[in-house]
Amino acid sequence: MDPILLLKALILGIVEGLTEFLPISSTGHLILAGDLLNFNDDRGKLFEIVIQSGAILAVVWEYRERLLKVARGAFSEPAAQKFILNLFVAFLPLAILGLAFGRAIKAHLFNPVTVASTFILGAFVILWAERREHKIRIQTVDEMSMLDALKLGIAQAFALIPGTSRSGATIIGGLLFGLSRKAATEFSFFLAIPTLIVATFYQLYKERALLNADDLAMWAVGFVAAFVSAFLCVRWLLRYISTHDFTAFAWYRIAFGIVVLATWQFGWVQWAAD
Protein backbone atom coordinates (compact mmCIF):
# COMPACT_ATOMS: atom_id res chain seq x y z
CA MET A 1 0.00 0.00 0.00
CA ASP A 2 1.05 3.59 -0.66
CA PRO A 3 3.28 4.76 2.25
CA ILE A 4 1.75 8.24 2.02
CA LEU A 5 -1.71 6.76 2.56
CA LEU A 6 -0.44 4.87 5.60
CA LEU A 7 1.05 8.10 6.95
CA LYS A 8 -2.32 9.81 6.53
CA ALA A 9 -3.94 6.90 8.37
CA LEU A 10 -1.43 7.29 11.19
CA ILE A 11 -2.07 11.03 11.53
CA LEU A 12 -5.85 10.70 11.45
CA GLY A 13 -5.72 7.84 13.95
CA ILE A 14 -3.76 10.04 16.34
CA VAL A 15 -6.22 12.92 15.84
CA GLU A 16 -9.15 10.60 16.59
CA GLY A 17 -7.52 9.19 19.70
CA LEU A 18 -6.50 12.57 21.10
CA THR A 19 -9.87 14.25 20.56
CA GLU A 20 -12.48 11.53 21.16
CA PHE A 21 -12.48 11.72 24.94
CA LEU A 22 -11.53 15.36 25.49
CA PRO A 23 -14.34 17.98 25.62
CA ILE A 24 -13.32 19.44 22.26
CA SER A 25 -15.27 17.38 19.65
CA SER A 26 -13.46 14.83 17.49
CA THR A 27 -15.74 15.44 14.49
CA GLY A 28 -14.55 18.95 13.73
CA HIS A 29 -10.91 17.98 14.10
CA LEU A 30 -11.25 14.97 11.80
CA ILE A 31 -12.96 17.06 9.12
CA LEU A 32 -10.21 19.65 9.24
CA ALA A 33 -7.40 17.08 9.31
CA GLY A 34 -9.02 14.99 6.57
CA ASP A 35 -9.29 17.99 4.28
CA LEU A 36 -5.73 19.12 4.94
CA LEU A 37 -4.55 15.60 4.11
CA ASN A 38 -6.84 15.38 1.07
CA PHE A 39 -8.55 12.36 2.60
CA ASN A 40 -12.14 13.51 2.92
CA ASP A 41 -13.90 11.35 0.31
CA ASP A 42 -16.22 8.41 1.05
CA ARG A 43 -13.20 6.17 1.64
CA GLY A 44 -11.88 8.62 4.19
CA LYS A 45 -15.22 8.86 5.98
CA LEU A 46 -15.43 5.07 6.23
CA PHE A 47 -11.90 5.08 7.62
CA GLU A 48 -12.98 7.52 10.35
CA ILE A 49 -15.73 5.10 11.36
CA VAL A 50 -13.29 2.19 11.54
CA ILE A 51 -10.66 3.96 13.65
CA GLN A 52 -13.29 5.01 16.18
CA SER A 53 -13.26 1.40 17.35
CA GLY A 54 -9.60 1.81 18.30
CA ALA A 55 -10.50 4.65 20.64
CA ILE A 56 -13.30 2.56 22.15
CA LEU A 57 -10.91 -0.32 22.82
CA ALA A 58 -8.58 2.06 24.67
CA VAL A 59 -11.28 2.78 27.26
CA VAL A 60 -12.17 -0.91 27.50
CA TRP A 61 -8.50 -1.74 28.12
CA GLU A 62 -8.02 1.04 30.69
CA TYR A 63 -11.01 -0.17 32.69
CA ARG A 64 -10.71 -3.87 31.84
CA GLU A 65 -10.65 -5.04 35.47
CA ARG A 66 -13.73 -3.01 36.37
CA LEU A 67 -15.59 -4.16 33.27
CA LEU A 68 -14.69 -7.82 33.84
CA LYS A 69 -15.93 -7.55 37.41
CA VAL A 70 -19.21 -6.07 36.15
CA ALA A 71 -19.54 -8.81 33.53
CA ARG A 72 -19.00 -11.56 36.10
CA GLY A 73 -21.56 -10.07 38.44
CA ALA A 74 -24.14 -9.14 35.82
CA PHE A 75 -26.57 -11.83 37.00
CA SER A 76 -25.73 -11.97 40.69
CA GLU A 77 -24.31 -8.74 42.11
CA PRO A 78 -26.64 -5.74 42.68
CA ALA A 79 -23.79 -3.23 42.21
CA ALA A 80 -22.92 -4.65 38.79
CA GLN A 81 -26.56 -4.76 37.76
CA LYS A 82 -27.03 -1.15 38.85
CA PHE A 83 -23.97 -0.11 36.83
CA ILE A 84 -25.25 -1.85 33.69
CA LEU A 85 -28.74 -0.42 34.12
CA ASN A 86 -27.36 3.10 34.56
CA LEU A 87 -25.35 2.80 31.34
CA PHE A 88 -28.40 1.51 29.49
CA VAL A 89 -30.60 4.34 30.78
CA ALA A 90 -27.95 6.94 29.92
CA PHE A 91 -27.53 5.48 26.43
CA LEU A 92 -31.23 5.64 25.53
CA PRO A 93 -31.76 9.41 24.94
CA LEU A 94 -29.01 9.66 22.32
CA ALA A 95 -30.08 6.40 20.67
CA ILE A 96 -33.74 7.41 20.42
CA LEU A 97 -33.13 10.98 19.31
CA GLY A 98 -30.38 9.88 16.94
CA LEU A 99 -32.67 7.45 15.15
CA ALA A 100 -35.47 10.00 15.02
CA PHE A 101 -33.53 13.09 13.99
CA GLY A 102 -30.07 11.93 12.87
CA ARG A 103 -30.66 12.40 9.14
CA ALA A 104 -32.31 15.79 9.59
CA ILE A 105 -29.48 16.98 11.81
CA LYS A 106 -26.87 15.86 9.30
CA ALA A 107 -28.76 17.54 6.45
CA HIS A 108 -29.43 20.87 8.16
CA LEU A 109 -26.93 21.38 10.97
CA PHE A 110 -23.72 19.90 9.62
CA ASN A 111 -22.29 23.18 8.32
CA PRO A 112 -19.38 25.39 9.38
CA VAL A 113 -21.50 28.06 11.02
CA THR A 114 -23.27 25.52 13.23
CA VAL A 115 -20.04 23.69 14.07
CA ALA A 116 -18.18 26.91 14.93
CA SER A 117 -21.11 28.34 16.86
CA THR A 118 -21.48 25.15 18.88
CA PHE A 119 -17.76 25.07 19.59
CA ILE A 120 -17.88 28.61 20.94
CA LEU A 121 -21.21 28.24 22.76
CA GLY A 122 -19.96 25.05 24.37
CA ALA A 123 -16.88 26.93 25.53
CA PHE A 124 -19.00 29.49 27.34
CA VAL A 125 -21.02 26.71 28.96
CA ILE A 126 -17.76 25.19 30.24
CA LEU A 127 -16.57 28.57 31.55
CA TRP A 128 -19.91 29.14 33.28
CA ALA A 129 -19.95 25.65 34.76
CA GLU A 130 -16.44 26.08 36.12
CA ARG A 131 -17.18 29.48 37.65
CA ARG A 132 -20.33 28.47 39.50
CA GLU A 133 -20.18 26.97 42.96
CA HIS A 134 -19.79 23.20 42.82
CA LYS A 135 -22.03 21.29 45.18
CA ILE A 136 -20.70 17.77 44.91
CA ARG A 137 -23.11 15.07 46.06
CA ILE A 138 -21.70 12.16 44.03
CA GLN A 139 -18.04 11.27 44.46
CA THR A 140 -17.93 8.02 42.45
CA VAL A 141 -19.80 6.41 39.58
CA ASP A 142 -21.12 3.74 41.97
CA GLU A 143 -23.10 6.39 43.88
CA MET A 144 -25.11 7.43 40.82
CA SER A 145 -28.83 6.75 40.73
CA MET A 146 -30.85 5.87 37.66
CA LEU A 147 -32.11 9.46 37.56
CA ASP A 148 -28.52 10.75 37.58
CA ALA A 149 -27.74 8.44 34.66
CA LEU A 150 -30.78 9.67 32.76
CA LYS A 151 -29.72 13.29 33.26
CA LEU A 152 -26.28 12.57 31.84
CA GLY A 153 -27.86 10.65 28.99
CA ILE A 154 -29.95 13.69 28.12
CA ALA A 155 -26.80 15.81 28.29
CA GLN A 156 -25.06 13.39 25.93
CA ALA A 157 -27.92 13.75 23.44
CA PHE A 158 -26.83 17.36 22.84
CA ALA A 159 -23.80 15.84 21.10
CA LEU A 160 -26.06 15.13 18.12
CA ILE A 161 -25.48 18.79 17.27
CA PRO A 162 -22.17 18.93 15.36
CA GLY A 163 -19.34 20.49 17.32
CA THR A 164 -20.85 19.87 20.75
CA SER A 165 -18.52 17.04 21.86
CA ARG A 166 -20.04 13.92 23.37
CA SER A 167 -17.50 13.80 26.17
CA GLY A 168 -17.84 17.53 26.80
CA ALA A 169 -21.62 17.32 27.09
CA THR A 170 -21.53 14.41 29.53
CA ILE A 171 -18.65 15.68 31.66
CA ILE A 172 -19.97 19.23 32.02
CA GLY A 173 -23.48 17.87 32.46
CA GLY A 174 -22.13 15.71 35.26
CA LEU A 175 -20.55 18.70 36.98
CA LEU A 176 -23.79 20.68 36.74
CA PHE A 177 -25.74 17.76 38.19
CA GLY A 178 -23.48 17.40 41.23
CA LEU A 179 -20.91 14.79 40.21
CA SER A 180 -17.26 15.16 41.13
CA ARG A 181 -14.84 15.75 38.26
CA LYS A 182 -13.59 12.19 38.45
CA ALA A 183 -17.07 10.67 38.57
CA ALA A 184 -18.29 12.80 35.66
CA THR A 185 -15.22 12.01 33.58
CA GLU A 186 -15.25 8.29 34.30
CA PHE A 187 -18.96 7.94 33.60
CA SER A 188 -18.36 9.75 30.30
CA PHE A 189 -15.71 7.14 29.49
CA PHE A 190 -17.97 4.23 30.45
CA LEU A 191 -20.92 5.67 28.53
CA ALA A 192 -18.71 6.02 25.46
CA ILE A 193 -18.37 2.25 25.22
CA PRO A 194 -21.98 1.31 24.30
CA THR A 195 -22.56 4.63 22.53
CA LEU A 196 -19.57 4.41 20.21
CA ILE A 197 -19.86 0.65 19.65
CA VAL A 198 -23.48 0.96 18.49
CA ALA A 199 -22.71 4.04 16.40
CA THR A 200 -19.69 2.37 14.78
CA PHE A 201 -21.52 -0.83 13.81
CA TYR A 202 -24.54 1.12 12.61
CA GLN A 203 -22.41 3.34 10.38
CA LEU A 204 -20.38 0.38 9.10
CA TYR A 205 -23.60 -1.40 8.16
CA LYS A 206 -24.84 1.67 6.30
CA GLU A 207 -21.54 2.03 4.45
CA ARG A 208 -20.90 -1.70 3.96
CA ALA A 209 -20.71 -1.30 0.19
CA LEU A 210 -17.48 0.67 0.65
CA LEU A 211 -15.73 -2.05 2.65
CA ASN A 212 -12.67 -3.27 0.77
CA ALA A 213 -10.08 -5.83 1.87
CA ASP A 214 -7.39 -3.76 0.12
CA ASP A 215 -7.80 -1.14 2.84
CA LEU A 216 -7.02 -3.50 5.73
CA ALA A 217 -3.46 -2.21 6.18
CA MET A 218 -4.69 1.38 6.27
CA TRP A 219 -7.41 0.49 8.80
CA ALA A 220 -4.90 -1.39 10.95
CA VAL A 221 -2.51 1.58 11.11
CA GLY A 222 -5.33 3.99 11.96
CA PHE A 223 -6.84 1.59 14.51
CA VAL A 224 -3.57 1.12 16.37
CA ALA A 225 -2.79 4.84 16.26
CA ALA A 226 -6.24 5.67 17.63
CA PHE A 227 -5.94 3.03 20.34
CA VAL A 228 -2.52 4.14 21.57
CA SER A 229 -3.25 7.88 21.46
CA ALA A 230 -6.69 7.45 23.08
CA PHE A 231 -5.23 5.26 25.83
CA LEU A 232 -2.55 7.84 26.61
CA CYS A 233 -5.13 10.63 26.45
CA VAL A 234 -7.50 8.89 28.88
CA ARG A 235 -4.64 8.29 31.33
CA TRP A 236 -3.51 11.91 30.98
CA LEU A 237 -7.01 13.35 31.44
CA LEU A 238 -7.59 11.40 34.65
CA ARG A 239 -4.37 12.84 36.06
CA TYR A 240 -5.10 16.33 34.73
CA ILE A 241 -8.53 16.68 36.35
CA SER A 242 -7.12 15.81 39.76
CA THR A 243 -5.43 19.24 39.85
CA HIS A 244 -7.08 21.29 37.07
CA ASP A 245 -10.50 22.31 35.84
CA PHE A 246 -11.76 22.33 32.22
CA THR A 247 -11.24 26.05 31.57
CA ALA A 248 -8.28 25.49 29.23
CA PHE A 249 -10.47 23.36 26.97
CA ALA A 250 -13.01 26.18 26.79
CA TRP A 251 -10.44 28.65 25.48
CA TYR A 252 -9.23 26.03 23.01
CA ARG A 253 -12.80 25.55 21.78
CA ILE A 254 -13.18 29.29 21.18
CA ALA A 255 -9.92 29.36 19.21
CA PHE A 256 -10.90 26.31 17.18
CA GLY A 257 -14.34 27.74 16.48
CA ILE A 258 -12.67 30.82 15.02
CA VAL A 259 -10.43 28.55 12.93
CA VAL A 260 -13.49 26.73 11.58
CA LEU A 261 -15.11 30.01 10.55
CA ALA A 262 -11.90 31.22 8.93
CA THR A 263 -11.31 28.02 6.96
CA TRP A 264 -14.90 28.15 5.72
CA GLN A 265 -14.96 31.88 4.94
CA PHE A 266 -11.75 31.73 2.92
CA GLY A 267 -12.51 28.35 1.34
CA TRP A 268 -9.52 26.57 2.85
CA VAL A 269 -11.54 23.54 3.98
CA GLN A 270 -14.44 21.76 2.28
CA TRP A 271 -16.93 21.72 5.15
CA ALA A 272 -19.69 19.51 3.76
CA ALA A 273 -22.02 16.90 5.18
CA ASP A 274 -21.65 14.46 2.33
From Swiss-Prot:
Its main location: membrane. GO terms for molecular function: undecaprenyl-diphosphatase activity. The chain crosses the membrane at residues 4-24, 46-63, 82-102, 109-129, 184-204, 218-238, 249-269. Keywords: Antibiotic resistance, Cell inner membrane, Cell membrane, Cell shape, Cell wall biogenesis/degradation, Hydrolase, Membrane, Peptidoglycan synthesis, Transmembrane, Transmembrane helix. The keyword Iron does not apply. GO terms for biological process: cell wall organization; peptidoglycan biosynthetic process; regulation of cell shape; response to antibiotic. It holds the Pfam family BacA. HAMAP family: Undec_diphosphatase (MF_01006). This is Undecaprenyl-diphosphatase.
